[in-house]
From Swiss-Prot:
Its EC number is 3.5.1.47. GO terms for molecular function: N-acetyldiaminopimelate deacetylase activity. It comes from Bacillus subtilis (strain 168). Pathway: Amino-acid biosynthesis; L-lysine biosynthesis via DAP pathway; LL-2,6-diaminopimelate from (S)-tetrahydrodipicolinate (acetylase route): step 3/3. The gene is ykuR. HAMAP family: DapEL. Coiled coil: none annotated. This is N-acetyldiaminopimelate deacetylase. NCBIfam families: amidohydrolases (TIGR01891). The active site is at 69, 128 (proton acceptor). It catalyses: N-acetyl-(2S,6S)-2,6-diaminopimelate + H2O = (2S,6S)-2,6-diaminopimelate + acetate. GO terms for biological process: diaminopimelate biosynthetic process; lysine biosynthetic process via diaminopimelate. Keywords: Amino-acid biosynthesis, Diaminopimelate biosynthesis, Hydrolase, Lysine biosynthesis.
Amino acid sequence: MKIEELIAIRRDLHRIPELGFQEFKTQQYLLNVLEQYPQDRIEIEKWRTGLFVKVNGTAPEKMLAYRADIDALSIEEQTGLPFASEHHGNMHACGHDLHMTIALGIIDHFVHHPVKHDLLFLFQPAEEGPGGAEPMLESDVLKKWQPDFITALHIAPELPVGTIATKSGLLFANTSELVIDLEGKGGHAAYPHLAEDMVVAASTLVTQLQTIISRNTDPLDSAVITVGTITGGSAQNIIAETAHLEGTIRTLSEESMKQVKERIEDVVKGIEIGFRCKGKVTYPSVYHQVYNTSGLTEEFMSFVAEHQLATVIEAKEAMTGEDFGYMLKKYPGFMFWLGADSEHGLHHAKLNPDENAIETAVHVMTGYFSVYAN
């Protein structure tokens, strides 16, 4: 498949962004592309709104897997591109449209240039939430198609096209969604002494949560608590009875995650006492760290560099969350960053990756699989 064809596919996918486990149009689009290939070369299995696609090897003794996430974000696109989102309020602001396109490019290559071993492609829904990797790993499909190895990539807007970045060991952080609900006694704004103000309680809570990082976390460790949204109150002259906070926790170790959560519970108990209210803490979605398999990762980096498939950079750990970590917990493999050179970063309404990154990724992965799947 030529790069022009892949870019056209990417733009089609960019127009139809869908949220986690709602990727019905996306799934059908992928099927329309894949069903053009000879069915003796590929096998397709639907899984919820995702897909498993096996490219049959000539004399398979093992199976190498590649994962591409397919969901979008609840963001109103502001790129002004002629192929901008047609689903208002949703946007491919994390590059998953490129991820899918790259996977299709790799599949196309190996349908026409078979290798010895089987290749399995996982088009995974709901990476952004509520988390598609764990349930996908439990599917019946993976009971008959068991990978020996798995890999994935993620675009990096801050890196130039033609580069990849990765490292052995920890690449992405442990992440957890955080939801806190406060409930007190509302009242008239003229009589604050007769009420318990949950907006003030929530404001105090936000500042106290940050002391967990500055005063309870080892300075040589890394942890981040972000409160992204606060809602509370119904009118300007009514003291709020409830407040709702949502955010994330990110750490570089599971022990730090445990400690941070314990301290959050303590801080919320203090708010309950101080503001005579009730607090409830929940963690709706938790993502395991992405930990690249030693040996395989270095081998991949050396291969790409030696064959000049891309410029290879030694990555640093990132506080990014990725449910691909669950797949690496079950199978050996690695993940890497793909340079995509965009002025605006991931999850930004103006993210506009350089589409030439698609060709780089297809070149890297077809070169790698051509050797390691033979």
